[in-house]
Structure formats: C-alpha cells, structure tokens
Design a protein with these regions (language model features):
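Structural and coupling elements of P-loop NTPases
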Residues: 1-700
Length: 700
C-alpha cells in the first residue's frame, strides 16, 4: 500500500447497535475498493474484521478491527482507515479506543430494526468526542423496511441535523436504486454498487422536494452571499452545494443519511464518495497535549514536517503473531528502524518494521505520516494510552477516556498449580482490554475479575482456555462485612499458667464501648491507678486489642469503631510478661465484645443510575427491592434522569444484567464505596452461622 499524507487520509469509525451491519459494511467497502477479492460473510466466519476464534464462534465483533482501504476520490487516490467496532455494550472499551482516534463516524442503522439502543449510544459518543457523522441505513433489500419512516424517527430523536442525501427507488417492492438529492438525479444499480442514471420516479418527487429544500436552506446559511442568492431564487451549482454542505457536516450541523444493502453490496460506492467529499481530513482537528520540557500546552495539527509524536490507542497481544501497538501519528513521520521515546515511561525503545493491520493481516509500509494509523510490533514497555515522541521533543497526549468496569466475579483456577499461568495470561488480556481488571482481594481471600458486563467476563474465560490453555471458574464474590458494638461492657481477662517453675500471669479489667468512628478499628486508652498494671505492659495490652480487631468474635470479620479502656488489673513480679498481658487482653476483648451488643456492618455504595425518564419508576422500584434508599433524581445534559441512591454492595451483584433488561440496554450505572451500616437481622444471622467455624479458631 502507498504512503499517504494528511490531506489524503480519512479515519472513520463504524458505530451502531450489535447486528446492525457494521462488519458487513466494512466488508463491502473493502470488496468494492479491491482490498479483497471476495466479500466475506459473518455466518461463514471469513470476514476481515471478525477473525478471532471467539468472534467466529459467537458471530459478533468483540474487538475493534482496523481495515485500511484505498479509493480514487475526486482529487486522486486516498486512504480510508476504517475502524470496525463491536456493537454489544460489554465491549464499549474497544469502541472508546477507536472513537478517540477517529476523525468522523458512520453510524450504521438497520432499516427494519430502526433506532436501537446502540444507535443512541453511538450518537452520544459522537457528541462526546465532537465527531462529524454520517448515518448509513442497511438492509434496504428488506421489502418490509421503510426508509421514510426511519428518517422521521431519526428527525424526532436527533433533531433537524438529520438530512437524507438519498431517497430509495423501488420496483415491485425491491430496492433497485436511489435518488441523489444533492444532484437531483436517479441512480439504478447495475452490478453490485455500480449504477447508471435513471428517471426520478413520480412517487419520489414530493419527498425529494422536502429533502432538497432542507439542504438548500443549510447551504444558504453558510454565507451572506449564499443567503441573498437563496432568497432571490438563484440556483446553486453542485460544487457550491457540496462545498457548503461539507462545512455543515464537519461542524455537525448536518448529518447525511445514506442507504444500501449489505447482502447485495449496493450503495457502497456512494458511501465512499460521501466519505471523500464530506468527511474531514485529520488536519481539520487538533490533538491537545503537554510539552513536557516546558510544561506548556501543546497543540498537534497533524503536520508531518515537525518532530514525531504519536498516541498508542490500542494493543493487540496474540500468542501466535505477538504484540502490536496501534497508534495514530499526531505530528511528524514515523520511520522503521528508528528510536522512539516513550514519554509516559521515560524510556527509549527501538522500532523495527512498520505495519498497517487489515484484520489479522499485516502490510509492511516504509513510513507513517501525520494523521495516519499504523502498528509497531514487539515494543517492550509501551502500552495503550502512552505517547511516543523524540527525547529531544517530549510531548505527552491525554490518555483515552475508557469506561470504568463495575461488574465483577470471583474466579479461581480449575487445575491446582495454574495460578501463575492464569495471572500471566490475564496480564496479556488486560494489555488488550483496558476495561478488564484483576484484583487480589486479600481481606476475603479471593481473586476478582472486573469487566463491563457478564458477557465480557464469559469471553475472557473462553479466551483463557482457548488461547492460553488455562481454565478458571467464575462464582459470586464474597463481600467484606465489619463488626462493631452498640453498648458498653466491663469485663476481666485473666491469663494464668502457674503449675510450678516459671509461669505466665496477666490480669486486665477493661471497658469496651462504641468509639463513634467507624473509619478506624479501635481507640485504646488507659485509666490505671496505683500501678495495678505496670506501664511497660500497656503496649502489650493494646497489641492484644489490635490483633483481636483483625478477626472479630462475632463472625471473624474485621472490627471497627471500638473504644477499649484498660482500667485495672494485677500482675506477678516473676510470671507476668508481655505475652501474658497480650493474651489476657485478647480474652477480655472477646468477652467484652460479645457482651456489648455486637452487630455486623455491611458495605454501602453510593449509586448513580442514568436512564430515560420512562424507566425511572421501574428502576426505583427495583432499587427498593434491593434494600436501596433513593436519595434524589436530577436531569443530565442528555435529557436523561440520574437517580442517586445508597445501596448495599451485596445487592449490586447481577445489577448490570437486570438494569439492561429493565431498560432495553440504555441504562447505565456507576458506584463507589460510601460507608458501613448495620446489616438487617436476617443477613447478620446468615453470616454468623456460615462463618461459625472461622470464629472457633479464635479461642485462646
């Protein structure tokens, strides 16, 4: 493949609901431009994008795939970097990485299915990253699909920016062509995406007039000259219309709507023309970073004449082909066999060959210029989000904003001794997927696997088995309770072993009461008079309290919020020791704790649930069933409701799946640990009974 400069490049991300036709669209574009000799099918497992075994087995995209294609546009050959993303929400991290380096988006919508949750999420992502967008309507070959109804729904949902650039032509209820609204011309498909001119059907004239007038109004708003010409009834030329519309598409005030049929490979040459004529080159945008040498803001304008800087947006780690770091060149030119400086890691690395990735295939290239996307193999320390530059010109760019994982499961190896293998394999998978996280929960003696959703975790388990030949089981995690007391108690702890010879003797009288501070295990004080307990044994008594707080007497959970006061005791001049007084204090703690109305505390989370208004009743009802307390509700800038609530952490298990079910997938949530609160009696009873064997081990 040739080397292309910034003005000849388009970086376009394919977004949309799962199953809408993104991968088929990418496949058709590759086929039409000659990048492939035949068009693969998802059902046959031979598409460019979905090459991973898990994707072939499940027949949907799991990872973002890069598909560079070449196309002869109006100004000569150009390169289009297609980023085909997953549509299922569990893999949103892949989508966010792709969107962060795209300069425009194609939102793929299935005409029959209409606006789906994935359509709305795609639109929100484009808004968040300020991406120009085109809507490409697929499945036009389905005679039950109504393009007109879909456009009306799009206008109602997304506003006046929706602009049909085409209207369908049907004969005998079959999709055979379209009307080009910009050029006011009919197009009939001949062979696949090829077409010939044809008459505009009479039934299209009314809708054509409406669509055409809307486009001309947008053209008129571009300048005062155009506005005057519009009101005087003067016609615009096609090139004037295209130039004006391009400005509106780039600033997002117009969203072209196009159409096609993936199964028949129709409409894709027109889509390529729109990418060429209306979507921006990388230099229409800026990449903001910091000049490390000065600490000042740095603005990259995709100029290949200045020093090199690039941002790594994705990492592929494959046991067979190795590690590839995918990056977008922000400034300068990256050349093979050169030395780069990883600004985040403050270290230099050697670059070997440079590649373009087309699905699983690698294409070697002599250089990568600003605005382009490519890959470098076998970088040692470089990870997703890192900036590479030259040591003499260190620039660092902001890392991509990736969704935080809130779903987690406990995992353990099926085969004893595989722990290190699993840990190594997960490290590789976490390099690829920033929404995947492994946590060693030492308190509960469990390993936790975090992700966006259950489906993602299921795929991870399958990858561990198929890629790395290690097997793990997922199960419900344990939750970290705490123990405390609700009233005051006064007890004695006496440890005495005097059966001849040097013995052991320690005697303490102590008070235990709530400290009022659940953020610390205990507060220790002493009020001993007359030397009943020598001062040199006070630290041993406190140590006994501290060790007792590690595993409480009620259910072997850590103790919090206890005030322990040493008030009296006795000692033996020969047999007393630090060990004896520590043991006596532990005996006193256990007895005093159990006499002070002990209770279990459960972890409480501060939860925010974001849903459209129509789902608020169901969501709040469900939160009440989960023992949640709704604190309030506010609207956000997307017109959705944000419900705030306190809820026990244990009740959030499985919440991701249930929330999606309640809201059709549109609902999202986030939470953070807030505090501990007393658990209901039935919860306490169950925990105490289940952990009785652990408490018995505390006997002294």
């Amino acid at each position: 493949m040739n080397v292309y400069g910034t003005k000849q490049i388009r970086n376009v991300v394919l977004l949309g609901h799962g199953g809408a036709g993104k991968t088929t669209t990418a496949e058709a574009l590759a086929f039409v431009t000659g990048a492939t000799k035949r068009m693969g099918k998802i059902t046959d497992g031979n598409t460019i994008s979905d090459y991973d075994k898990e994707e072939i087995k499940r027949q949907f995209s799991i990872s973002t795939s890069l598909i560079p294609i070449e196309y002869e546009g109006d100004d000569g050959m150009m390169k289009i970097n297609l980023l085909d993303t997953p549509g299922y929400f569990d893999f949103v991290g892949e989508v966010e990485e792709a969107v962060s380096v795209a300069d425009a988006a194609i939102i793929v919508v299935n005409c029959k299915a209409g606006i789906e949750v994935g359509t709305e999420k795609a639109w929100e992502l484009c808004d968040k990253f300020k991406l120009p967008r085109v809507i490409f309507v697929t499945n036009m070959d389905d005679d039950r699909a109504s393009f007109r109804e879909l456009v009306l729904k799009l206008e109602r949902r997304f506003g006046r920016s929706i602009a049909p650039f085409q209207l369908p032509i049907r004969e005998n209820e079959k999709f055979v062509g379209y009307v080009n609204v910009v050029k006011m011309a009919g197009r009939r498909f001949t062979n696949l995406s090829d077409y010939e001119e044809c008459e505009i059907p009479d039934y299209s004239l009314k809708n054509l007039g409406i669509a055409r007038d809307a486009l001309l109004e947008a053209v008129a708003e571009t300048s005062e000259e155009y506005m005057e010409r519009y009101f005087s009834g003067e016609e615009f030329t096609v090139s004037e219309i295209q130039g004006a519309l391009r400005e509106h598409v780039i600033d997002g005030s117009i969203v072209p709507v196009l159409m096609g049929s993936g199964i028949n490979c129709q409409g894709f040459k027109t889509l390529l023309q729109v990418i060429d004529r209306y979507l921006p080159t990388p230099d229409k945008f800026e990449c903001i970073g910091v000049d490390v040498s000065t600490g000042e803001r740095f603005t990259a304008k995709y100029d290949d004449s200045v020093s090199l800087s690039a941002r790594v947006f994705k990492t592929i780690v494959d046991p067979f082909i190795g590690k590839y770091s995918l990056m977008k060149i922000c400034t300068g030119t990256l050349k093979p066999d050169s030395t780069i400086y990883n600004v985040n890691k403050d270290t230099e690395e050697k670059v070997g060959k440079l590649y373009l990735l087309r699905g699983k295939d690698t294409i070697e290239v002599p250089e990568l210029k600003a605005g382009d996307i490519g890959a470098v193999a076998k970088l040692g320390v470089t990870q997703t989000g890192d900036t590479i530059a030259l040591r003499s010109a260190p620039i660092v760019y902001h890392k991509p904003q990736i969704s935080i994982p809130y779903t987690y499961m406990r995992y353990k190896t099926v085969t004893k001794g595989d722990e290190d293998k699993v840990s190594s394999a997960l490290t590789k998978l976490m390099e690829e997927d920033l929404t995947l996280k492994s946590v060693n929960d030492k308190e509960n003696r469990q390993l936790l696997l975090y992700g966006i959703g259950d489906q993602q975790l299921e795929v991870v388990v399958s990858k561990l088995l198929n890629r790395y030949k290690v097997e793990v089981e997922l199960s419900k995690p344990k939750f970290a309770f705490r123990e405390t007391i609700r009233k005051k108690s006064e007890v004695q702890g006496k440890y005495k072993k005097q059966s001849g010879g040097h013995g052991q003797y320690g005697d303490v009288k102590m008070e235990f009461e709530p400290s009022g501070d659940l953020s610390t295990p205990y507060i220790f004080e002493e009020r001993v008079f007359g030397g009943a307990v020598p001062k040199n044994y006070f630290p041993a008594v406190e140590k006994g309290v501290a060790e007792s707080c590690l595993k409480g007497p009620l259910a072997a959970y850590p103790v919090v919020g206890v005030k322990a006061t040493l008030v009296d005791g006795s000692y033996h001049p020969v047999d007393s020791s630090e060990m004896a007084f520590k043991t006596a204090a532990m005996m006193a703690f256990k007895k005093g704790f159990m006499e002070a109305n002990p209770v279990l505390l459960e972890p409480i989370a501060s939860l925010k649930v974001t849903v459209p208004d129509k789902f608020t009743g169901d969501v709040m009802g469900d939160l009440n069933r989960r023992r949640g307390r709704v604190l309030g509700m506010n609207s956000n800038h997307h017109g959705k409701q944000v419900i705030e609530a306190d809820i026990p952490m244990s009740e959030l298990f499985g919440y991701n799946t249930d929330l999606r079910s309640m809201t059709g997938g549109i609902g999202t949530y986030e939470y953070e640990f807030a505090r501990y609160e007393q658990a209901p009696g039935d919860i306490q009873k169950k925990e105490v009974e289940e952990r009785a064997s652990k408490v018995d081990k505390l006997d002294v």
